[in-house]
């Protein structure tokens, strides 16, 4: 069962990695070429992506596959992968999906406001959103 469990984990986390790549591409686009009017739509996209990623990392099968892996049957590289997957799963499982979505929403809003504030040299306009984002980050860390 260990080989099958590891193969399933590898496939699952490959998909999660692709979602991370998509998020980075969307972030890059937002930072370089996206017009201001696209911020709300991009925020919704990033929020959906964060929720989907969270669901994939925390689904019950992942916990079962992690438990079913036999470290003795794995290469050192695979063992390191399983340790990283387990850390990712445990962290994600301890954070509610609603908080993940709220973080994505707040991060998008804060970045949009920051870009405008930087251009206008008006930090005070972004301060409330930044405070909200920091509060959510603290909640995630708790």
Model features per residue range: what roles?
Residues 1-142:
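A well-structured
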């Amino acid at each position: 069962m260990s080989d099958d469990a590891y193969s399933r984990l590898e496939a699952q986390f490959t998909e999660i990695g692709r979602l991370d790549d998509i998020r980075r591409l969307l972030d890059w686009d937002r930072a370089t070429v996206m017009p201001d009017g696209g911020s709300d739509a991009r925020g919704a996209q990033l929020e959906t992506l964060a929720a989907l990623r969270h669901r994939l990392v925390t689904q019950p099968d992942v916990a079962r596959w992690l438990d079913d892996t036999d470290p003795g049957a794995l290469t050192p590289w695979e063992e390191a992968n399983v340790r990283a997957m387990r850390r990712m799963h445990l962290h994600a499982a301890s954070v509610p999906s609603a908080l993940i979505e709220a973080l994505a929403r707040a991060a998008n809003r804060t970045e949009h406001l920051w870009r405008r504030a930087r251009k206008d040299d008006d930090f005070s306009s972004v301060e409330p959103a930044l405070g909200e984002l920091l509060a959510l980050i603290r909640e995630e860390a708790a």
